[in-house]
């Protein structure tokens, strides 16, 4: 598969006759404490569409209209008058790349999570600090692949997906839904007096001097990180739920069951000592958990992490139900009180005084003995439609971070789940042998 780039340009908000942003009241949007707690990195995803697809000029025009409603993505990161990190609403533009492939898309489908897919989207290093970079690639058969690369400090997965949806709606000429909510100042005020109920040191924050203690694997083929896509059918998930929910007052969720199962399988594959501590960090969306609720259209980050922890021996020797109980308890703990405790701590002055930094560190390339989970199961990726139909395939880009687990709904649309599992190559055969076992 040879990808040829034909053009690359900055697309700016298209305001039309008015020439200014409607309802614009600020040129700088300070990052919230929840934005700053997230990963300072770019995340890339890939969509595939069957023909027909609108011409590139139509997609570009739709992008310009969508950026009127989402000026953040046409801006740049900088600082505000107080020296705090902020999004500068300078309308510098989002990157728009046009490319072609020399093969029919069917010949390379399904796309595999290898370095080859990196050619289907821009890199975050490609532009002059652009926050959103998009590549549209036309295949020889007429199929279209759209690759997005977005700065995670600007928004979480749900908010970024809302922008993708808005672009498709603007391209079709329909109203943007959900309506974006840009007010980052009103939702996350600290309480008076501050009330820090939970420990946030060592959870969301770590000392600065540990920020660059990156663990790397040794050289050699066995220490290469490879990403394996695992497909869990609806039937497998039903059996897993029945096993994990036995005797419980209500069935456990698909997310909890699949994460518990993969946590155990990955721990077995790694061959951890039974007394070694292992945890799984699960991203928890606070929109519906906070009171008052944060609107679905909120454009920033509203994510903290549940961190169930146990020993490797306890995890693998006890049934999956035990792991589900650990996960359920910790996820439930990340409630309104926890979010507000975090906000109070982040505004208490302790972060600056103690020189703390976010534990969400994109430089960490090896997470063992731990796991981190990004669940995209409830994000409506398959609702995106430029006018030629919804995508028939979606995937994250190649991201070889050992232990970073990404879950998403299968494109089959039948309730099955796809999991992207990065492990050292030396551990992958063992993982493949146990990941479909319910023993």
UniProtKB/Swiss-Prot annotation:
The keyword Acyltransferase applies. The active site is at residues 152, 385. One of its GO terms (molecular function) is agmatine N4-coumaroyltransferase activity. The gene is ACT-2. Monomer. The lineage of its organism: Eukaryota, Viridiplantae, Streptophyta, Embryophyta, Tracheophyta. Belongs to the plant acyltransferase family. Involved in the synthesis of hordatines (antifungal hydroxycinnamoylagmatine derivatives). Specific for agmatine as the acyl acceptor, inactive towards tyramine and putrescine. Has activity with the acyl donors 4-coumaroyl-CoA, cinnamoyl-CoA, caffeoyl-CoA, feruloyl-CoA, and to a lesser extent sinapoyl-CoA. It comes from Hordeum vulgare (Barley). This is Agmatine coumaroyltransferase-2. It is an enzyme of class 2 (transferase). InterPro entries: CAT-like_dom_sf (IPR023213), Plant_Fungal_Acyltransferase (IPR050317). Its EC number is 2.3.1.64. Keywords: Acyltransferase, Transferase.
């Amino acid at each position: 598969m040879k990808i040829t780039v034909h053009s690359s340009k900055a697309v700016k908000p298209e305001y039309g006759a008015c020439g200014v942003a409607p309802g614009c009241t600020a040129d700088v949007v300070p990052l919230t404490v929840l934005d700053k707690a997230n990963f300072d990195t770019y995340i890339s995803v890939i969509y595939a569409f069957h023909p027909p697809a609108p011409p590139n000029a139509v997609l570009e025009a739709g992008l310009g209209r969508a950026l009127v409603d989402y000026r953040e993505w046409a801006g740049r990161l900088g600082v505000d008058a107080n020296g705090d990190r902020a999004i500068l609403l300078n309308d510098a533009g989002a990157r728009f790349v046009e490319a072609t492939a020399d093969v029919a898309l069917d010949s390379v489908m399904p796309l595999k999570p290898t370095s080859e897919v990196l050619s289907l989207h821009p890199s975050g290093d490609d532009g002059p600090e652009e926050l959103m970079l998009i590549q549209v690639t036309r295949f020889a058969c007429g199929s279209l692949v759209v690759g997005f690369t977005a700065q995670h400090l600007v928004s979480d997965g749900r908010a970024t997906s809302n922008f993708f949806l808005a672009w498709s709606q603007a391209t079709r000429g329909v109203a943007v839904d959900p309506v974006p909510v840009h007010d980052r100042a009103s939702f996350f005020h600290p309480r008076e007096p501050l009330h820090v109920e939970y420990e946030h040191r060592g959870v969301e924050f770590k000392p600065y001097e540990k920020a660059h203690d990156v663990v790397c694997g040794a050289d050699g083929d066995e220490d290469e990180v490879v990403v394996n896509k695992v497909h869990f059918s609806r039937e497998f998930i039903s059996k897993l739920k029945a096993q994990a929910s036995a005797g419980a007052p209500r069935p456990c969720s698909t997310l909890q069951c699949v994460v518990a199962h993969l946590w155990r399988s990955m721990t077995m594959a790694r061959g951890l000592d039974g007394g070694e501590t292992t945890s799984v960090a699960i991203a928890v969306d606070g929109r519906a958990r906070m009171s008052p609720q944060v609107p679905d259209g909120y454009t920033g980050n509203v994510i903290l992490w549940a961190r169930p922890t146990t020993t490797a021996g306890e995890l693998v020797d006890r049934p999956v139900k035990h792991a589900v109980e650990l996960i359920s308890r910790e996820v439930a703990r990340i409630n309104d009180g926890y979010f507000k405790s975090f906000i109070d701590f982040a505004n208490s002055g302790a972060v600056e005084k103690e020189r703390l930094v976010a534990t969400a560190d994109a430089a960490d390339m090896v997470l063992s003995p731990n796991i981190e989970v990004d669940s995209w199961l409830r994000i409506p990726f398959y609702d995106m439609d430029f006018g030629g139909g919804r995508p028939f395939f979606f995937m994250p880009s190649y991201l070889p971070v050992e232990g970073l687990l990404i879950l998403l709904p299968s494109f089959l649309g039948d309730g099955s789940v796809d999991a992207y599992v990065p492990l050292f190559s030396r551990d992958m055969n063992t993982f493949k042998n146990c990941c479909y076992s319910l023993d």
